[in-house]
Amino acid sequence: MKKQSGFTLIELVMVIVILGILAATALPKFADLSSDAEKASLQGARGSVSSASSIAHAAYLVDSTTVSIEGTAVAFANKYPTAATIAAVAGLAATDFTTSVTGTVATITKTGGTADCAFTYTEAAANAAPTISVVADGGTSAAVCP
């Protein structure tokens, strides 16, 4: 009898089936990378808005007449940037982020992203800091957005 040296057809088919199952399990994770990138981008923008608000507030406390940050004149409400100027103060490019202002609330979304994933900047009330809140899944689920 000949000594077997190699794999049988059944062994090769089983390996292919197992690799197919592993690929089908892993594919959804890799297919969702664009959503992860959108979330990370919004987290960065949210941090930028928070920092810019604090920096502008500190500048206002030092010199309460006119404050200009990176060439942008800052309008204030209760010693913090207004909703209309916060995106410019934070340096959020209009090509990357869309800002819509309704009254004292600015809603910031990623340009080309989903409307379900956004955050809001609400102007400061008297003797309080502004509020930066996550809006996710139409405001019903924080699982969609960080």
Please annotate each region the language model reported.
Residues L19, L27, S35-A40, A83-A94:
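Short alpha-helical interface patches
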Residues M1-S34:
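N-terminal single-pass transmembrane signal-anchor helix
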Residues G6, D32, S41, S68, ...:
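Residue-level preference for alpha-helix termini and adjacent loops
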Residues L19-G20, S50, K110-G112:
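Alpha-helical interaction segments
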Residues A37-D63:
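Membrane-proximal N-terminal amphipathic helix
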